[in-house]
Amino acid sequence: MFEKLSCHTSIKIGGRVKYLVLPNDVFSLERAITVLKDLPFQIMGLGTNLLVQDEDLDIAVLKTERLNQIEIKGEKVLVESGTPLKRLCLFLMEAELGGLEFAYGIPGSVGGAIYMNAGAYGGEIGEFVEAVEVLRDGEKTWLSRNEIFFGYRDSTFKREKLIITRVMMSFKKEKKETIKAKMDDYMRRRLEKQPLDLPSAGSVFKRPREDFYVGKAIESLGLKGYRIGGAQISEKHAGFIVNAGSATFDDVMKLIDFVRKKVKEKYGVELETEVEIWWNGRRW
């Protein structure tokens, strides 16, 4: 009955949950929510920007990875929320639709990316959204772009109880070779700078302001490689915390708190976490 979430998060941390449900389509997701209406639940995409407590959680988790259909409609694309971002980027390249190249190499699902308005290299996924289909109190409805707020690593979906099911996105025609060259460049930069060889939950902290680079600030404090238990500030990019071996939820949380304290002391800046935290069955 119980399923370890450490097998479903990119940082390889997480306790057991009562039920892990993998709906095959949007209808199955709706049905699962109806069945689980009296049991607390959380939605998970690919678990790539997520830190989960080690203790058992008395909840169900609905994992959307099987909701991965993509349809092309001219310069518009309808994509299900569990679709990996990498797969969407490759699909767009083949369709000669440009704009999302910056997202190539960002781990995670389309739904998770929309939820947090994921971005990199000056681009954000919210720029390409035309409408989002959601489940609100179990009812399916579409939100148009002017009904949706997107901010820096923030969106309507973080503030309201909405479950993203499908997204309509709009792109511009561009040559496949041009798109591929951009994607290859972004991937090369990621491989050079990010610790993709070790389990992590991605970038840990939000940038507090445009001119403040968190990784460089942490590095300036001499904290690259600093370790608490099995959690370590990456030696490659100080904005990442990696699981260097049997790290626990508490190890990572203590390291996050330590970094926040040191940055506050040196720079007077309060760091907010970008990574999503599940503790006591709630999102933080």
From Swiss-Prot:
<dbReference type="Pfam" id="PF01565">
    <property type="entry name" value="FAD_binding_4"/>
</dbReference>
<keyword id="KW-0132">Cell division</keyword>
<dbReference type="GO" id="GO:0008762">
    <property type="term" value="F:UDP-N-acetylmuramate dehydrogenase activity"/>
</dbReference>
<dbReference type="InterPro" id="IPR016166">
    <property type="entry name" value="FAD-bd_PCMH"/>
</dbReference>
<feature type="active site">
    <location>
        <position position="153"/>
    </location>
</feature>
<dbReference type="InterPro" id="IPR016169">
    <property type="entry name" value="FAD-bd_PCMH_sub2"/>
</dbReference>
<dbReference type="InterPro" id="IPR003170">
    <property type="entry name" value="MurB"/>
</dbReference>
<feature type="domain" description="FAD-binding PCMH-type">
    <location>
        <begin position="12"/>
        <end position="174"/>
    </location>
</feature>
<dbReference type="GO" id="GO:0071555">
    <property type="term" value="P:cell wall organization"/>
</dbReference>
<comment type="function">
    <text>Cell wall formation.</text>
</comment>
<keyword id="KW-0573">Peptidoglycan synthesis</keyword>
<keyword id="KW-0285">Flavoprotein</keyword>
<keyword id="KW-0961">Cell wall biogenesis/degradation</keyword>
<dbReference type="GO" id="GO:0009252">
    <property type="term" value="P:peptidoglycan biosynthetic process"/>
</dbReference>
<dbReference type="GO" id="GO:0071949">
    <property type="term" value="F:FAD binding"/>
</dbReference>
<dbReference type="InterPro" id="IPR006094">
    <property type="entry name" value="Oxid_FAD_bind_N"/>
</dbReference>
<dbReference type="InterPro" id="IPR036635">
    <property type="entry name" value="MurB_C_sf"/>
</dbReference>
<keyword id="KW-0521">NADP</keyword>
<dbReference type="GO" id="GO:0050660">
    <property type="term" value="F:flavin adenine dinucleotide binding"/>
</dbReference>
<dbReference type="GO" id="GO:0051301">
    <property type="term" value="P:cell division"/>
</dbReference>
<keyword id="KW-0560">Oxidoreductase</keyword>
<keyword id="KW-0133">Cell shape</keyword>
<dbReference type="GO" id="GO:0008360">
    <property type="term" value="P:regulation of cell shape"/>
</dbReference>
<feature type="active site">
    <location>
        <position position="274"/>
    </location>
</feature>
<comment type="similarity">
    <text>Belongs to the MurB family.</text>
</comment>
<dbReference type="GO" id="GO:0005829">
    <property type="term" value="C:cytosol"/>
</dbReference>
<dbReference type="InterPro" id="IPR016167">
    <property type="entry name" value="FAD-bd_PCMH_sub1"/>
</dbReference>
<dbReference type="InterPro" id="IPR011601">
    <property type="entry name" value="MurB_C"/>
</dbReference>
<dbReference type="InterPro" id="IPR036318">
    <property type="entry name" value="FAD-bd_PCMH-like_sf"/>
</dbReference>
<keyword id="KW-0274">FAD</keyword>
<feature type="active site" description="Proton donor">
    <location>
        <position position="203"/>
    </location>
</feature>
<keyword id="KW-0131">Cell cycle</keyword>
<protein>
    <recommendedName>
        <fullName>UDP-N-acetylenolpyruvoylglucosamine reductase</fullName>
        <ecNumber>1.3.1.98</ecNumber>
    </recommendedName>
</protein>
<keyword id="KW-0963">Cytoplasm</keyword>
<comment type="pathway">
    <text>Cell wall biogenesis; peptidoglycan biosynthesis.</text>
</comment>
<dbReference type="Pfam" id="PF02873">
    <property type="entry name" value="MurB_C"/>
</dbReference>
